[in-house]
């Protein structure tokens, strides 16, 4: 399904790693991850993946808990076509010149589509890169992530940015794009 350059853009290789799971596998594996309390936060169900390889075997994705370099969002029963909608929205954001993370649709072993994105808070070796979000910069706890305003965020950007005017323009472009595409989840952690 992948054009070689598209594979290289997100996976660093023209050969796309195998996603050897089916939707049924993912449901079981997700339950195990939840029981082990190593889940990624957020509204949508998601799993952390990394690429593993061994001699004479193709690269493949494995579920790794919190520290993977990729995030996988499978289809859900409640909201059909969420992976397709998220990928389309990210492509529209790119066309609107909004900076986005590397992303794509990928097929499970049974052919079902899932959304995959590369984490920007990890190095190529999977080491954590320090990043701050607006909760941290506004000194709010995560449980108060919905208790902010666009005005407050703009003021924080003006206070901490090394290029505040450019960053505030970029921020407002993201706000307008989110409004146009119906993204109502732009809280202080996003």
Which residue stretches match the model-derived regions?
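Phosphate/dinucleotide-binding and metal-coordinating scaffold of catalytic cores
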Residues: 1-190
């Amino acid at each position: 399904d992948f054009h070689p350059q598209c594979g290289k853009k997100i996976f660093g290789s023209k050969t796309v790693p195998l996603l050897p799971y089916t939707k049924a596998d993912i449901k079981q594996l997700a339950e195990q991850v939840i029981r082990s309390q190593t889940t990624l936060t957020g509204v949508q169900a998601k799993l952390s993946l990394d690429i593993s390889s061994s001699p004479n075997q193709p690269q493949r994705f494995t579920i790794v808990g919190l520290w993977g370099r990729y995030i996988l969002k499978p289809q859900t029963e409640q909201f059909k076509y969420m992976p397709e909608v998220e990928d389309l929205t990210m492509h529209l954001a790119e066309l609107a010149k909004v900076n986005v993370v590397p992303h794509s649709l990928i097929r499970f072993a049974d052919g079902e589509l899932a959304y995959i994105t590369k984490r920007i808070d990890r190095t190529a070796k999977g080491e954590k890169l320090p990043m701050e979000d607006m909760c941290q910069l506004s000194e709010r706890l995560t449980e108060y992530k919905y208790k902010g305003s666009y005005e407050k965020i703009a003021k924080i950007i003006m206070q901490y940015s090394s290029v505040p005017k450019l960053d505030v323009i970029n921020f407002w472009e993201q706000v307008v794009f989110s409004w146009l595409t119906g993204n109502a989840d732009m809280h202080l952690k996003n």
